[in-house]
Design a protein with these regions (language model features):
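Active-site-proximal loop/turn and secondary-structure-junction residues that shape catalytic pockets
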Residues: 10-12, 35-37, 64-67, 103-107, ...
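Catalytic-core regions built around general acid/base machinery
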Residues: 44-55, 131-135, 139, 196, ...
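Active-site acidic/histidine proton-transfer and metal-coordination neighborhood
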Residues: 70, 74-178
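Histidine-acidic metal/acid-base catalytic patches
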Residues: 1-27, 96-97, 159-181, 185-266
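Conserved beta-strand positions in the central sheet of alpha/beta enzyme cores
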Residues: 32, 60-62, 100, 147, ...
Length: 266
């Protein structure tokens, strides 16, 4: 059975300890952290260390910033790399597994005007390889993993499918860089999400879950049995981290996720 986590902002409670108490009661195995910019995640280290001492399980962190390592602007790109390095170091310090980030988010979409980005595909690739290599080397030194998340075509123009992420990771050639898959984005971009998991299984390091409409698993029409079944066949042993919006009563919605996923084959 796969382990299930909830991102911290979804859980009721003021402290990580209170959130963890609720999470355990609902059937979760862990909390996925969120990391804002301006080195905010590093400033939380005393809080995180105390939570760890109190038994809170926090294996992964997901970036929560407005710019990313694939940014068009050199200064923003450099800052994103500095932030991600810090986040990787912090998650390593609390005994975690890794940090998840997309190449970019909301910066450009080929599906919306003006349709052609200001940077060539060749330069995009160079930028992504440079960033992934630098971050991957830092992750390796810290003993953790960088998870590259493909986003759908309306949110990013560079890495939309598992195939694209896998190609970049192969070229980087570091075991410390892996794909962080997301069921919502895969539902939009992959013609066969389950087959995509099987095809790229060696490169998958982390999984985030939400349904076809971005709400909690069970609120949409994603084929969970096929998706989860593919992860089992692929030998995936990581976490399923709920990164979603909530429909209905938010407390009951987040409470419903573990039972739904387990009932669907997790």
């Amino acid at each position: 059975m796969l382990k299930i986590a909830a991102q911290e902002q979804l859980l009721p409670g003021e402290s990580l300890q209170h959130k963890w108490e609720f999470a355990q009661g609902a059937g979760y195995d862990a909390i996925e952290l969120r990391a804002k910019g301006d080195l905010h995640f590093a400033s939380r280290l005393p809080e995180l260390k105390q939570a760890l001492k109190d038994g809170v399980v926090m294996p992964t962190v997901c970036v929560d910033m407005l710019h990313f390592f694939g940014a068009f602007d050199d200064g923003l790109r450099r800052d994103a790399i500095v932030q991600m390095k810090s986040q990787l170091s912090v998650i390593a310090e609390i005994g975690g597994l890794g940090a998840q980030t997309p190449a970019s988010y909301g910066m450009f979409s080929r599906r919306l005007p003006p349709f052609e980005p200001p940077r060539s595909e060749e330069r995009d690739r160079e930028i992504l390889l440079e960033g992934l290599t630098e971050l991957g080397e830092h992750a390796s030194a810290e003993g953790v993993t960088l998870y590259l998340e493909p986003l759908n075509r309306y949110e990013d123009h560079m890495v939309n499918r598992l195939e694209q992420a896998a190609e970049l990771i192969k070229e980087v050639g570091l075991d410390s860089v892996r794909i962080g898959i997301d069921s919502y984005h895969m539902n939009i971009e992959e013609s066969d999400p389950a087959q995509a998991i099987l095809t790229h299984a060696p490169y998958i390091g982390h999984a985030q879950v939400s349904d076809s409409n971005r709400f909690q698993p069970g609120a949409g029409h994603l084929d969970w049995q096929a998706w989860l079944g593919a992860l089992h066949i692929a030998g995936y042993e990581g976490y399923l981290a709920a990164e979603c919006r909530l429909t209905g009563d938010p407390v009951e919605a987040v409470r419903s996720v573990p039972a739904f996923l387990k009932g669907s084959g997790a």
